[in-house]
């Protein structure tokens, strides 16, 4: 509803038949008052929402009421001090721990009833129902992976639970246990780690991490903004050509593979990392790293000199790395261990460079590796939106194959961001590349014209991922001596044709599932490859 004379919106509601998950009804009401100069100031705001998990069931009615008072346009020392801070939202330390008496005395609208201020009571009542209680627990473990050691202010989280049981060709069955501390134990000092054991190779692996935060944290170490110094040591297996960006390699949902997972060696790595994030969206990381890669019977290191192959058990690099990132107005969903982007409306720029010198701190090779990337979401009004990710990189020196650029292959049947669903691990070797990942979400633009599909609220997806790469002669063991021979017979350098795969999919199946069917368009004559396949993932959206 809009006042004609004042030309301002007073209230707004969503149609009941809108293609929106979980929300059956929504009403927004706002009241304004005029300042002395005629400016309209928001005085009162009320948002009413009725949530429903499924049709035909009772929903949850929620109402949020906010009142705004004490506007002032007179400059004050307190205001100058507040606006000088870089934070967009300033939250006092004690804001979340005020007693009930404080709010009773200071809440500006006495008309707010007890029912409108009883979220805690509502949640307690809901958790009294076994279905809701166990659904909340299961979803929490699925999406965060961690179990708190207590209901209130847990000192320690156990997990990730979805990485407890896994396996691969080198290790056989693998068990893993770990956890991390929280700010309730110490708001500045955080610990994290795990221990794992493979029953086939009978080797113990693990990670130990200690991080000092210069900023006081509320719950977790990775809360924005991060300003920390982290010491980390890890000894584990290296799954060549596989790098899962938003989940652990031990995730049980990745256990079922479309091909044998046998491109695996070992590594030991010590890192010291300084991280600083700014409210402007700019951040940087400085890392000093000592890494040793060890061969295995699956991935032998055989140094080639003419026709002679000499076994090498391991090699080491001592490197420094600088990462720059600029993501203005970025929004993300934060879990205990990771961040998942929820808004890519503003572009995200990344730039990194890694450098190592032969003989410096025991490094066996000179190594320079540069990476750059940009990602952006483009909206097309009622026609949906497109997420675009572009990346490029180059290795500048002559190095063995583990230090080359291996495209990120996804061997599981799940949908994984920035990976190739039909490429085999170590299928291609490059020392320079350019890649793209384009996904078009139509938001029901086509399906909404079909009555049954509109009722199901299914939504269409079209995707295209590709990579153009090149391997120079100096890094090709077939053309240059002193390198490790490629351990996999099917490994090749890319030709002039880029690798391309496309997919069509449906999301919002049962409101939580996404299904894609993917086709491989190029290099279809390669032995042992999948030319097409069905992929699935959990994808909850409104």
Model-derived features with residue positions:
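Exposed, low-structure sequence patches enriched in small/polar residues
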Residues: 9, 85-542
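Cleavable N-terminal export/targeting peptides
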Residues: 67-91
């Amino acid at each position: 509803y809009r006042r004609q004379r004042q030309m301002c919106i007073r209230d707004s509601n969503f149609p009941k038949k809108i293609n929106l998950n979980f929300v059956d009804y929504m009403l927004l009401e706002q009241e304004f008052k005029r300042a002395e100069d005629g400016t309209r100031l928001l005085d009162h705001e009320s948002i009413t929402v009725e949530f429903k998990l499924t049709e035909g069931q009772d929903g949850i009615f929620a109402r949020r009421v906010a009142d705004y008072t004490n506007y002032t346009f007179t400059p004050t020392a307190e205001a100058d001090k507040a606006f000088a801070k870089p934070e967009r939202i300033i939250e006092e330390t004690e804001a979340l721990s005020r007693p009930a008496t404080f709010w009773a005395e200071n809440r500006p609208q006495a008309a707010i009833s007890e029912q409108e201020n009883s979220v805690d009571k509502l949640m307690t009542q809901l958790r009294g129902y076994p279905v809701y209680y166990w659904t909340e627990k299961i979803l929490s473990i699925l999406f965060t992976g961690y179990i708190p050691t207590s209901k209130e202010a847990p000192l320690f989280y156990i997990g990730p639970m979805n990485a407890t049981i896994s396996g691969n060709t080198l290790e056989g069955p693998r068990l893993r246990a770990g956890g991390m501390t929280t700010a309730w134990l110490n708001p500045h000092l955080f610990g994290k780690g795990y221990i794992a054991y493979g029953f086939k190779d009978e080797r113990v692996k693990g990670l130990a991490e200690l991080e000092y935060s210069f900023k006081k944290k509320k719950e977790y170490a990775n809360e924005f903004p991060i300003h920390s110094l982290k010491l980390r040591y890890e000894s584990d297996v290296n799954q060549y050509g596989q790098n899962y960006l938003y989940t652990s390699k031990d995730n049980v949902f990745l256990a079922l593979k479309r091909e044998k997972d046998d491109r695996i060696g070992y590594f030991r790595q010590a890192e010291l990392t300084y991280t600083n994030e700014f409210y402007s969206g700019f951040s940087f990381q400085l890392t000093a790293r000592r890494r040793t890669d060890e061969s295995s019977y699956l991935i032998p290191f055989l140094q080639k000199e003419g026709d002679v192959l000499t076994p090498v058990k391991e090699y080491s690099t001592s490197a420094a790395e600088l990462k720059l990132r600029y993501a203005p107005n970025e929004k993300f969903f934060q879990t205990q261990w990771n961040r998942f982007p929820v808004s890519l409306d503003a572009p995200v720029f990344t730039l990194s460079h890694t450098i190592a010198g032969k003989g410096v701190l025991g490094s066996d090779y000179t190594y320079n590796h540069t990476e750059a990337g940009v990602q952006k979401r483009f909206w097309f009004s009622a026609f949906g939106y497109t997420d675009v990710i572009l990346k490029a990189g180059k290795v500048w020196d002559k190095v063995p194959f583990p230090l080359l650029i291996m495209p990120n292959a996804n061997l599981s049947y799940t949908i994984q961001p920035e990976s190739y669903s039909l490429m085999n691990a170590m299928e291609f070797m490059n020392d320079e590349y350019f890649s793209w990942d384009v996904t078009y979400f139509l938001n029901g633009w086509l399906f909404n014209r079909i009555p049954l599909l509109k009722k199901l609220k299914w939504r269409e997806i079209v995707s295209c991922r590709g990579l153009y790469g090149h391997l120079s002669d100096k890094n090709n063991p077939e053309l240059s001596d002193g390198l490790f021979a490629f351990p996999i017979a099917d490994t090749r350098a890319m030709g002039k044709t880029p690798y391309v795969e496309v997919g069509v999919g449906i999301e919002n199946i049962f409101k939580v599932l996404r299904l894609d069917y993917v086709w491989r368009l190029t290099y279809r004559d390669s032995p042992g490859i999948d030319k097409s396949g069905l992929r699935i993932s959990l994808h909850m959206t409104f």
